[in-house]
């Protein structure tokens, strides 16, 4: 079994506020290409954390890929009350994260910052690598997790970058 943590930018961090934004199709095309390659290399578990944006788009791609490949998807939320204040549209997306093969919560609710450290350590200890949509030139809070991942010599990180998205777009696929 090979498990990969999937995480990256949230939609608002990318300035994507509509599900109909054409850039999302390019992102999903890149996700699909990358994930098929990972599956062919032996990845059979994809671990999500329930965030909107990249993770949700990855979830949509994974649900399609499950029809053709023997893969499993897990959502491991940091807190049971994750997303409880989201609007109705986002709550529907949250519900989709709860329809995967395995769902777990690390903590009932947020109490202190050390919970995030323990949560991230757990995610890294239970995955062999990560698939990240992240660029160090466009930092977010994800930078702390990325720094910890880089400290682990055997932890493989596959990045989806803005340059890669441009390549996918220029390939001229029908989006």
Swiss-Prot record:
Pfam families recorded: YpsA
InterPro entries in alphabetical order: YspA
Coiled-coil regions listed: none
Signal peptide limits: none
Domain of life the protein comes from: Bacteria
SUPFAM superfamilies hit by this protein: MCP/YpsA-like
Homology family: Belongs to the UPF0398 family.
NCBIfam families, sorted: PRK13660.1
PANTHER family reported for this sequence: UPF0398 PROTEIN SPR0331, UPF0398 PROTEIN YPSA
HAMAP family referenced in this protein's UniProt entry, alphabetically: UPF0398
Name of the protein: UPF0398 protein SUB1405
Organism in which the protein naturally occurs: Streptococcus uberis (strain ATCC BAA-854 / 0140J)
Taxonomy of the source species: Bacteria, Bacillati, Bacillota, Bacilli, Lactobacillales
């Amino acid at each position: 079994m090979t498990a990969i943590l999937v995480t990256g930018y949230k939609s608002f961090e990318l300035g994507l506020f509509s599900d109909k934004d054409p850039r999302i199709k390019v992102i999903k095309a890149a996700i699909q290409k990358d994930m098929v390659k990972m599956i062919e290399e032996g990845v059979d578990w994809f671990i999500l954390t329930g965030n909107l944006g990249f993770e949700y788009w990855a979830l949509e791609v994974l649900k399609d890929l499950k029809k053709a490949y023997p893969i499993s998807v897990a959502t491991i939320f940091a807190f049971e009350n994750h997303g409880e204040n989201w609007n109705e549209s986002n709550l529907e997306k949250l519900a989709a994260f709860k329809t995967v093969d395995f769902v777990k919560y690390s903590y009932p609710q947020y109490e202190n910052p050390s919970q995030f450290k323990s949560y991230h350590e757990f995610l890294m200890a239970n995955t062999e690598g990560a698939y990240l949509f992240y660029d160090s030139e466009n930092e977010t809070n994800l930078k702390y997790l990325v720094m910890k991942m880089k400290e682990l010599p055997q932890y493989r990180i596959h990045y989806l970058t803005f340059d890669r998205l441009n390549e996918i777009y220029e390939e001229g696929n029908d989006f």
